[in-house]
């Protein structure tokens, strides 16, 4: 009798657990969530023609299109894979000396901002 009760309870609660899990997954928008971070933290150095980061790497962060184009070294975003995405490696401090330079800047990204960038890349880095 207890097994039947537990199975019934589990079947009843399973849809609730699925709804809660889906509701807690935050959808990240480039325009609403990511772009304001880029404008606040990155665009001064990564905008043509004179931004220091732009002149050194060719990485232009003025638009989604130029971000996705990448730098002279190649793409900086691997949609769906923040672990292999060079941008994430930099802002998360996983890129050696260059990451340390970013951390010393006057206005480094907060942990929450880094999380937003990570989630956006993991969700496919869409222009939405």
Predicted regions and their residues:
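N-terminal export/targeting leaders of redox proteins
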Residues: 1-29, 126-128
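Aromatic- and Gly/Pro-enriched helix-to-coil junctions and flexible linker segments
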Residues: 22-128
């Amino acid at each position: 009798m207890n097994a039947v009760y537990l199975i019934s309870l589990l079947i009843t609660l399973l849809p609730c657990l699925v709804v809660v899990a889906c509701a807690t997954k935050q959808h990240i928008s480039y325009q609403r969530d990511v772009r304001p971070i880029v404008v606040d933290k990155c665009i001064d150095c990564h905008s043509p023609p004179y931004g220091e980061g732009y002149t050194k790497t060719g990485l232009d962060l003025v638009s989604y299109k130029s971000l996705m184009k990448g730098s002279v070294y190649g793409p900086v975003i691997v949609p769906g894979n923040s672990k292999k995405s060079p941008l994430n490696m930099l802002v998360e401090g996983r890129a050696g000396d260059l990451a340390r330079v970013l951390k010393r800047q006057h206005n480094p990204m907060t942990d929450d901002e880094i999380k937003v960038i990570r989630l956006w890349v993991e969700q496919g880095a869409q222009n939405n």
